[in-house]
Amino acid sequence: MAAESLPFTLETVSSWELEAWYEDLQEVLSSDENGGPYSSSLGNEEGESKTFTTLDPASLAWLTEEPGPAEVTSSSQSPRSPDSSQSCMAQEEEEDQGRTRKRKQSGQCPARGTGKQRMKEKEQENERKVAQLAEENERLKQEIERLTREVEATRPGSDRPHVNLQQV
């Protein structure tokens, strides 16, 4: 049996993007549990609400690839008139902007929180490294001082004239 290819690429995805997809998935799943299409206020001035139904494969491809406008009309749109495809693209852009606005208004910005946590962890790790290096530096200074004292103690003995026993 041949393996099917994945509908998306396995590239690195930023944490904020994953969080956004996760939130969208939670919204869709909660609408399925409630027995119908999901209706949500997107936070725009008119209080307009959009109805979301299940995602089709073209929408998933659009979410994962984020293609330019030409690719959207060629890959995910059925043959329509130019006006209808432009209005559909505008609607998708409005939905995307609405989701972004909703996340910003709700105060959920996971990338910043995660980023701050990572920065804090890295800062703590760097502080530990600095402390270890300072201890090592102090130990090496003490070793240098000890060796310097040892050299100074042996130097007077080495200044005596050497006697060549073969000449006698």
Swiss-Prot record:
One of its GO terms (molecular function) is cAMP response element binding protein binding. Residues 118-162 have a biased composition (Basic and acidic residues). One of its GO terms (cellular component) is CHOP-C/EBP complex. It comes from the Eukaryota. Residues 101-129 are annotated as: Basic motif. Disulfide bonds: none annotated. Heterodimer. Interacts with TCF7L2/TCF4, EP300/P300, HDAC1, HDAC5 and HDAC6. Interacts with TRIB3 which blocks its association with EP300/P300. Interacts with FOXO3, CEBPB and ATF4. The N-terminal region is necessary for its proteasomal degradation, transcriptional activity and interaction with EP300/P300. Belongs to the bZIP family. This is DNA damage-inducible transcript 3 protein. The lineage of its organism: Eukaryota, Metazoa, Chordata, Craniata, Vertebrata.
